[in-house]
């Protein structure tokens, strides 16, 4: 249908953003656009020259030809360029925030689909360019924002993670990217180590955004520019939850004093191994969301919210007073036990089913569920973990 959105091949859909992550990138792009608008230094003659050159680049197949009117002589006019357009989900959310927007994609079929869809969506300020990203980047005019989402599959169709293995190689393009874009937003695999990604960009990264939805880490976003940054701002996002810090702040903050099994049972560690007890009242358990887990800022998280870690590698936290606004799941602990058979029997006497999870424990969740003879599901939550003193403990909880 002429008024219906057309969908691309399966491989292109695999790397598409969800609406929720696309909206977050649009929110970020809007802020970046405002930050760059007052710093436009491109002269009128340069804009016209670049616009004219852009129409005559050898080897480019433009579906929509850029005109002088699209490259306004108003130097306050804003431009966004998506160098790896794909299906155009991110572009369709970012483009309306700018006066002009260029969609670049090397696949001619996707360009045709994008051109149709942009018309359906009413994106009158969008231009579609069938080109390699590297070629357009070389000859395009300066932009307020460049967005790039390198393909994360190799020539054999296998998935890649490292920046250098993606197409195009953003680290190799870095000097040209930051010279042409006042701000550059780079979308990377959530599997990538964000510390290494920042290092690979040689000081150009100003911001890192770790984006999760529904408890699953979806995207790693870098914001780069031509400045050199010793301190990088890191924002962890999970749906409506936000947690921000500088990377030096996160690295320098160690875990506060840990919670050992003796404190959990209100007894000494020496006797805790044979005990089952009602948890000290009240006791609350906190599980960080996926973006926090990816960021690894556990010491800073504990300090900011006044929490204690159950163990050095448990990534679970406790407090005796409920904390509001914690970025993750919160539970009320109703009881706790060691792995002692009689203690477990007393703890789970009235529990037939539960949601079982393990953290830093030599058992899988399925193995622990089987050992405890529990069915999956229900309103109860069972966490198996290792306390600071090495004791394996089981916590029975209710979700708050």
Task: Spell out what each predicted region is.
Residues 1-400:
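SAM-dependent transferase fold signal centered on methyltransferase-like domains
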């Amino acid at each position: 249908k002429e008024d219906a959105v057309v969908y691309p091949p399966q491989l292109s859909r695999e790397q598409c953003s969800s609406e929720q992550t696309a909206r977050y990138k649009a929110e970020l792009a809007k802020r970046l656009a405002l930050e760059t608008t007052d710093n436009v230094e491109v002269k009128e003659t340069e804009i016209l020259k670049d616009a004219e050159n852009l129409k005559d680049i050898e080897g480019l197949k433009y579906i929509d030809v850029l005109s002088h009117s699209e490259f306004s002589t108003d130097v306050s006019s804003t431009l966004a360029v998506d160098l790896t357009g794909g299906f155009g989900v991110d572009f369709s959310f970012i483009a309306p925030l700018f006066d002009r927007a260029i969609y670049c994609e090397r696949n001619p079929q996707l360009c045709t689909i994008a051109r149709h869809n942009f018309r359906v969506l009413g994106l009158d300020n969008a231009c579609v360019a069938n080109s390699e990203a590297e070629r357009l980047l070389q000859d395009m005019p300066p932009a307020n924002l460049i967005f790039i989402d390198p393909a994360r599959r190799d020539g054999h169709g296998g998935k890649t993670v490292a920046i250098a293995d993606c197409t195009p190689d953003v680290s190799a393009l870095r000097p040209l990217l930051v010279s042409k874009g006042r701000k550059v937003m780079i979308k990377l695999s959530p599997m990538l180590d964000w510390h290494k990604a920042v290092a690979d960009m040689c000081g150009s990264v100003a911001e890192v955004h770790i984006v999760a939805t529904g408890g699953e880490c979806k995207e790693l976003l870098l914001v780069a520019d031509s400045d050199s940054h010793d301190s990088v701002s890191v924002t962890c996002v999970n749906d409506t939850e936000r947690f921000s810090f500088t990377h030096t702040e996160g690295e320098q903050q160690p875990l506060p004093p840990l919670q050992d099994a003796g404190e959990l049972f209100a007894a000494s560690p020496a006797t805790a191994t044979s005990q089952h007890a009602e948890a000290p009242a009240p006791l609350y358990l906190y599980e960080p969301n996926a973006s926090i887990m990816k960021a690894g800022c556990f010491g800073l998280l504990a300090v900011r919210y006044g929490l204690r870690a159950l163990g050095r590698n448990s990534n679970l936290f406790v407090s005796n007073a409920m904390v509001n606004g914690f970025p993750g799941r919160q539970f009320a602990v109703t009881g706790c036990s060691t792995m002692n058979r009689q203690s477990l029997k007393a703890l789970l006497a009235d529990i037939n089913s539960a949601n079982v999870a393990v953290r830093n424990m030599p058992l899988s969740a399925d193995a622990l569920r089987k050992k405890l003879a529990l069915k999956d599901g229900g309103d109860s939550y069972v966490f198996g973990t290792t306390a600071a003193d090495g004791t394996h403990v089981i916590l029975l909880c209710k979700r708050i």
